[in-house]
Amino acid sequence: MNFEQLGLIKPILDALKVQGYEQPTPIQEKAIPSILQKRDLLGSAQTGTGKTAAFAIPILQNLSEKEQNRNQIKALILTPTRELAIQIEENFKAYSKNLKLKSLVIFGGVKQHAQEQQLKKGVDILIATPGRLLDFISQGIIKLHHLEIFVLDEADRMLDMGFVHDVKRILKIIPAKRQNLFFSATMPKEIANLASEILVNPIKVEVAPVSSTADTIQQSIYFVEKDNKTDLLIHLLQDQKLDQVLVFSRTKHGADKIARKLHASKISAEAIHGNKSQNARQNALNNFKSKKTRVLVATDIAARGIDIDELKYVVNYELSDVSETYVHRIGRTGRAGSEGTSFSFVDGLDLANLRSTEKLIGKKIPVVKNHPYHTDDLVEQKRDSNNKPFTPRPKPQQKSEIGFKKPKNKGFFRKK
């Protein structure tokens, strides 16, 4: 299928061609027709699936079909962080370059005057973080009486960052009659309950978790004791060609600790996670993109806003308990056919995660032994506990109409 077959108008098709889009991703193919029909939608998709385009493109088409009053916000996209909000707004601007629709992003951590002046000029589509949006609403600067489309993006991350209460306050303010688009990578109970409160007879779109890695990524395992991991990282960074390295840490505290130790070794490094202010996260990301900072240490949730096309090096300081996370982490490199390299540090506590990860991707990851911190004990442990015939995990089927399992309560979603 191509974008023309999705029924998109020529101004949008032309903009997509400029962006180099040729074929829709699975979530775009499934979601765009339903959103064009103005249905509510519940989408489960990870970062890197083309999710933003899946809702931005049909929103632009639906709004372009009617005469717009610039003093009335018609679409609101609510997202948890400044960096994600900026990224979404950049996408809206790219897709709408041939349309008369105007989008704006607002977020906290900066003075509000400039954002207020832009709002006064008129906006069709508003991308916002919860706190700044509520500030503007309470001051009477933003009115949402004419809102037609509400998008809640990264709902699980909203929960993780403590924004669910703010989201519920916003829901009480916006018109009850509207189209709702709800996206979440995971579906914990509280998020499922929130979805049931918001959505009306939704179309459910679930993109199966990615289980394969790009052939352009050179993957490797380093067996190393936990206490030697930072020393190993510093050892690898002695190679100056590793000029831009994204390091994944399992915890916020761990990310800070790694960044401090690298800094103490005269290696420029910053940490990015949910406890950092939006200003601090954006500054760290900007420094990393411009290569002022050589190493960015991130937690998985914070890394969702990181989109760097030419990133070549990713380090898994620990392996995640969720095997699919490995695929998403190393998928930050080796994009669009370019070459990338991933280094994964494995200690005794990581062995079970390594086995499940290799089962998911259907292949063994090569082990690098020629480094000062290699331990044969870990190799033997892995070999002894993994001597069964190796078979890859079957890939889950992708289903567009079968999403999350409904709880026994039949009223999971409101009916019209």
Report the location of each language-model feature:
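Conserved helicase RecA-like core
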Residues: 2-377
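Basic Arg/Gly/Lys-rich low-complexity intrinsically disordered segments
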Residues: 262, 290, 355-416
